[in-house]
């Protein structure tokens, strides 16, 4: 699969192009192995607020191979009501494959779905990742670092706003991203108008990103949290998701009382 992406973060722009190849092999009724190759050319530019003090600006090349294992007993991939899904992946990018950005990345997730009664589903999901960068010099290479916030994780916050911060000489802060993160969510999906495919959802999210100076901390005080509600519609284009998230606890500068998130994807 080929791609060409442009993404504007708060403190920089990330532009990339490349491709991915993936193939898998079933090892049982519920388990599979997958192998991946990824090439991506990443350009970081438009640094803001003197962020060049800490960020490495320019172009990096990722050339990586990956191995993953999946165990999945869900009764439906788009709208599961029971079962579990868990994955573990490792990705290696180094000069052997032609990269100039060297790292090893580990990612894992686990989800459990409970059928409370007909068309009522409770789910819990936890995911996390760790990336070990090598030979990157004094400045931070942000292209592969982790940010939370947005429609796919902490829905009470703007996209990519949850991140460790670094103080600049100007007195401003920049979000440097984490080399690790953890995210949890508890969701309850219920019918509103089944004949049209419309459902409602209640959710609680908790998670955070951490830089090299900190370990992942499961202390609730250290995690950013939100609650909210939303709607799911199985449209002809696929599942549509509209969520209203409300952050809990003390808000930092630039954070709103609530966020509205829209996306297309699975119901959960």
Predicted features by range, described:
Residues 1-80, 84-87, 154-156, 160-167, ...:
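Gram-negative/organellar outer-membrane beta-barrel architecture
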Residues 21-25, 67-71, 108-112, 126-128, ...:
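Residues on the lipid-exposed face of transmembrane beta-strands in outer-membrane beta-barrel proteins
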Residues 29-35, 75-78, 117-122, 194-198, ...:
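Repeated loop/turn-to-beta-strand initiation elements of outer-membrane beta-barrel proteins
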Residues 42-49, 134-146, 212-216, 254:
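Outer-membrane beta-barrel and related beta-rich outer-membrane complex signature
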Residues 119-203, 211:
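Extracytoplasmic gating/loop element in the C-terminal half of outer-membrane beta-barrel translocons
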Residues 213-268:
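C-terminal beta-signal and terminal closure region of outer-membrane beta-barrel proteins
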């Amino acid at each position: 699969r080929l791609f060409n992406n442009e993404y504007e973060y708060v403190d920089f722009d990330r532009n990339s192009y490349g491709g991915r190849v993936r193939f898998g092999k079933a090892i049982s009724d519920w388990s599979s192995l997958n192998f991946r190759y990824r090439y991506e050319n990443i350009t970081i530019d438009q640094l803001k607020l003197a962020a060049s003090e800490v960020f490495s600006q320019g172009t990096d090349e990722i050339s990586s191979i990956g191995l993953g294992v999946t165990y999945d007993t869900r009764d439906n991939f788009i709208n599961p009501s029971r079962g579990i899904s868990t994955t573990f992946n490792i990705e290696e990018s180094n000069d052997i494959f032609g990269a100039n950005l060297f790292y090893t990345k580990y990612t894992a997730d686990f989800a459990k779905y409970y059928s409370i009664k007909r068309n009522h589903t409770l789910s819990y999901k936890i995911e996390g990742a760790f990336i070990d960068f090598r030979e990157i010099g004094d400045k931070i290479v942000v292209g592969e670092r982790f940010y939370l916030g947005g429609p796919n994780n902490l829905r009470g916050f703007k996209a990519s706003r949850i991140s460790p911060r670094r103080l600049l000489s100007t007195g401003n802060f920049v979000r440097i991203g984490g080399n690790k993160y953890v995210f949890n969510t508890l969701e309850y999906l219920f019918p509103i108008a089944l004949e049209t495919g419309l459902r409602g959802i209640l959710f609680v999210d908790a998670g955070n990103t951490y830089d090299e100076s900190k370990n992942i901390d499961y202390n609730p005080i250290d995690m950013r949290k939100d609650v909210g509600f939303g709607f799911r519609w199985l449209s002809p284009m696929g599942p549509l998701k509209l969520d209203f998230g409300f952050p809990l606890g003390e808000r930092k500068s630039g954070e709103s009382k609530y966020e509205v998130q829209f996306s297309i994807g699975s119901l959960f």
